[in-house]
Amino acid sequence: MDLIYIPEDLSSCPKFGNKSCPPTNRSFRVRMIMYLFMTGAMVITIFGNLVIIISISHFKQLHSPTNFLILSMATTDFLLGFVIMPYSMVRSVESCWYFGDSFCKFHASFDMMLSLTSIFHLCSIAIDRFYAVCDPLHYTTTMTVSMIKRLLAFCWAAPALFSFGLVLSEANVSGMQSYEILVACFNFCALTFNKFWGTILFTTCFFTPGSIMVGIYGKIFIVSRRHARALSDMPANTKGAVGKNLSKKKDRKAAKTLGIVMGVFLACWLPCFLAVLIDPYLDYSTPIIVLDLLVWLGYFNSTCNPLIHGFFYPWFRKALQFIVSGKIFRSNSDTANLFPEAH
């Protein structure tokens, strides 16, 4: 999600001429290093999430409610890497927007939409894991295909309506005279918020769902510990039978992994959303380099997700081998066993 630094003194703005770019003080070497680093993050984001999308879509063994939510979230991360990050990279390195005002509004709207969509997906995944671990007897009747479809529709539609409605109406910059002058003078494109909408965005779109996720995973952790303790107290000859009803090890492991995904998300996006909340009350005095770093820290979350899957999910590594080796193109490859340890 884009942020903006608005200088207090805009009297020097006209000397650049209307819709010009202020000169950058970054050397060629610094710009090349920035391009290399950002391009690397972008490539990992695009291809890593593409592997997740292909794997869950192709292999029937991965067709589960949780994985369909993960597939949709990977699509969000893929779009961020493919559509948003390239243009943000040029803007961050060159300190200028070369792509026009109309595309600027689309870019800002789509950027915010994807950020919020990720949050909503994580909330949905947390709910799914809650029922799987804490109420397994009712999981299959609660998290049905129709329920997953409704969750996915909400995860995409609500952020889209909110983001595009807010940016296109320009309600987020209402009353910000400095912003209007800056846009008139420079080839400039960044998403910023006045005090009202900055507070609304942080409270309703980050703090509230973030608190819900933390609460749900806290409950999952407590229940998992209780199950593990109960299993350890069982006689050896009854552990196997009781374990199937008391707790599913795979579900607990999945909940733990997705909890790590949630933790990384909060760590990456919390500083950015705090800037959205606080910067308007500081008269937008946060240096532009700091805001750029916060934005790219948020983007980096989409880079981390496939790396987390690769580290914690054996099926991801197995599916990657199928894709890289070309075995995925063989007949009946969609029925391949990605969990050999389960047999």
UniProtKB/Swiss-Prot annotation:
Compartment(s): Cell membrane
Membrane topology of this protein: Multi-pass membrane protein
Transmembrane feature ranges: 36-56, 69-89, 151-168, 173-193, 199-223, 258-278, 288-308
Disruption phenotype annotation: Mice lacking Taar3 show decreased sensitivity to isoamylamine. Mice lacking Taar2, Taar3, Taar4, Taar5, Taar6, Taar7a, Taar7b, Taar7d, Taar7e, Taar7f, Taar8a, Taar8b, Taar8c and Taar9 show no visible phenotype or behavioral deficits. They however show an absence of aversion to low concentrations of amines such as 2-phenylethylamine, isopentylamine, N-methylpiperidine and cadaverine.
Glycosylation sites: N18, N25
PROSITE patterns: G_PROTEIN_RECEP_F1_1 (PS00237), G_PROTEIN_RECEP_F1_2 (PS50262)
InterPro entries to which the protein is assigned, alphabetical: GPCR_Rhodpsn, GPCR_Rhodpsn_7TM, TAAR, TAAR_fam
Cytoplasmic side: 57-68, 169-172, 224-257, 309-343
The entry's keywords: Cell membrane, Disulfide bond, G-protein coupled receptor, Glycoprotein, Membrane, Receptor, Transducer, Transmembrane, Transmembrane helix
GO molecular-function terms, A-Z: trace-amine receptor activity
A cellular-component GO term for this protein: plasma membrane
Extracellular side: 1-35, 90-150, 194-198, 279-287
Pfam families linked: 7tm_1
GO biological process terms held by the UniProt record: sensory perception of chemical stimulus
Cystine crosslinks: C21-C185, C104-C189
Leader sequence residues: none
Region (Extracellular Loop 2 (ECL2)): 173-186
Keyword Glycosyltransferase: no
Function: Olfactory receptor activated by several primary trace amines, including isoamylamine. Activated by isoamylamine and cyclohexylamine, but not to the corresponding alcohols, isoamylalcohol and cyclohexanol. This receptor is probably mediated by the G(s)-class of G-proteins which activate adenylate cyclase.
Protein name per the record: Trace amine-associated receptor 3
Species, as recorded: Mus musculus (Mouse)
Gene assigned in the entry: Taar3
